UniProtKB/Swiss-Prot annotation:
Glycans are attached at N37, N86. Pfam families: Inhibitor_I29, Peptidase_C1. Residues 1-26 form the signal peptide. This is Probable cysteine protease RDL6. It comes from Arabidopsis thaliana (Mouse-ear cress). The gene is RDL6. Disulfide bonds join C154-C195, C188-C229, C288-C339.
Length: 356
């Protein structure tokens, strides 16, 4: 029976290679057998495959690879234990799988504060008697959502949230989807502190108004670091303008649903949990607070097996979550919404198809 172990390892190798060659998402894993722990050999092999998938390399200084491997093992154990419970969502080996939870939190420390909101709360989407909202909405199917983007290690989620909301609105109003420049916001919208501060989408919307629009991603591409504002580029060739912006009434998921039925909406969430860090698929209803520290965009909503959810676009590339998206439980018992998703919702306004 000496051939059994090599055969098993060959099967494991082929399974993991298949997973790594599949469309990008948080890495799926071969299940553990009967709840038993994985062997060190298996974990080391998965770690090497994960490193290859994410282009990870480590220096030998101060035992960095050993520390990262230990973090990876801890996260893999956490994933296996969670997925064995058959809860409403699954975890996987995201790009953060070699980090401790504290390192993950420190990577994007920005914290948009609801008290910093501009006084732009509107009753535009407050529910009215007789309202009949669609049971489900998915702006991706309407061609109003560009491909998933990646903010890298720059704390620029606010810029990606702003841009995605404006891209979607422009498609709805003009019929044209244009990928816009987050880098212009990072470099030129100084009040939001680029990669280093707690940017707000409202402030970025106001910048677009003052700046007479925003350039395309093609003409002002993303660099992942904060640079000097290219004033020449920033004041010419504007491809999209907006007229105003408004805030959804805070702590009101029904108003938020009505807003999303009309357009993609920028939101803030609390992303600090290990479950959020390692989210892979299905409807997330896991632990999280309401101390907002990350900006995303709701691009739709729906229901599945009696559970309502939001379709939320992230800016961590396609190897996190469900190809870059997360479904967050909707109509949560707390009016702030799960992870505070109803606390800081806002959207741009465009009154005509002209971008002049």
């Amino acid at each position: 029976m000496g051939f059994v172990r090599p055969v098993c390892m060959t099967i494991l190798f082929l399974l993991i290679v298949f997973v790594l060659s599949a469309p990008s998402s948080a890495m799926d894993l071969p299940a553990t057998s009967g709840g038993h722990n994985r062997s060190n050999e298996e974990v080391e092999f998965i770690f090497q495959m994960w490193m290859s998938k994410h282009g990870k390399t480590y220096t030998n200084a101060l035992g960095e690879k050993e520390r990262r491997f230990q973090n990876f093992k801890d996260n893999l154990r956490f994933i296996d234990q969670h997925n064995a419970k058959n809860l409403s969502y699954q975890l996987g080996l995201t790009r953060f799988a070699d980090l401790t939870v504290q390192e993950y939190r420190d990577l994007f420390p920005g914290s948009p504060k609801p008290k910093q909101r501009n006084l732009k709360t509107s009753r535009r989407y407050v529910p009215l008697a007789g309202d009949q909202l669609p049971e489900s909405v998915d702006w991706r199917q309407e061609g109003a959502v560009s491909e998933i983007k990646d903010q890298g290690t720059c704390n620029s989620c606010w810029a990606f949230s702003t841009v995605a909301a404006v891209e979607g609105l422009n498609k709805i109003v003009t019929g044209e989807l244009i990928s816009l420049s987050e880098q212009e916001l990072v470099d030129c919208n100084l009040v939001n502190n680029g990669c280093y501060g707690s940017g707000l989408m409202d402030t970025a919307f106001q910048f677009l108004i003052n700046n007479n629009g925003l350039d395309s991603e093609k003409d002002y591409p993303y660099q992942g670091t904060q640079g000097s504002c290219n004033r020449k580029q920033s004041t010419s060739n504007k491809v999209i303008t907006i007229d105003s912006y408004e805030d959804v009434p805070a702590n009101d998921e029904i108003s938020l649903q009505k807003a999303v039925a009309h357009q993609p909406v920028s939101v803030g969430v609390d992303k600090k949990s290990q479950e959020f860090m390692l989210y892979r698929s299905c409807i997330y209803n896991g632990p999280c607070g309401t101390n907002l520290d990350h900006a995303l965009v709701i691009v739709g909503y729906g229901s599945e097996n009696g559970q309502d959810y939001w379709i939320v676009r992230n800016s961590w590339g396609t190897t996190w979550g469900d190809a870059g998206y997360i479904k967050i439980a909707r109509n949560f018992e707390d009016p702030k919404g799960l992870c505070g998703i109803a606390m800081l919702a806002s959207y741009p306004i465009k009154n005509s198809a002209s971008n002049a």
